């Protein structure tokens, strides 16, 4: 897939647009991501999932460099502590959220596993404890979390309600053996 294959009008006009930074790890996907983000031009709800998968990257430094280049082009960034460390050099949730905001995002969401989730804007801070469940399989929990974030943003929910829904959605999926029910 190259940037020439992208439906740029649809990308520009979408109410929400989500990328995974794994797509920045190699060409031609990297250029396609940059073309899409350039087309979005920081429109509301342009989301970067800081999804760091080491097997796709040459090294952490390359991942850091590439992710740093896109942060000013997105309005929302979501990642766990390790992903934030790779993206912006901060593992501490509070400092990571602040660094993401300083990099240009409007909403920074730091997932902390069993310690819950921290979400920050320039004017609001929400700390949500984990929704307690017996974990059977974590596969798909992040997807459910992200889907609930998108739903909350598009529905105009408060940040607190959005993060609560995301935490709960992720917990429900992790409490099941299979991730599709």
Model-derived features: where do they sit?
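Conserved phosphate-binding/catalytic region of the ribokinase-like
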Residues: 38, 89-181
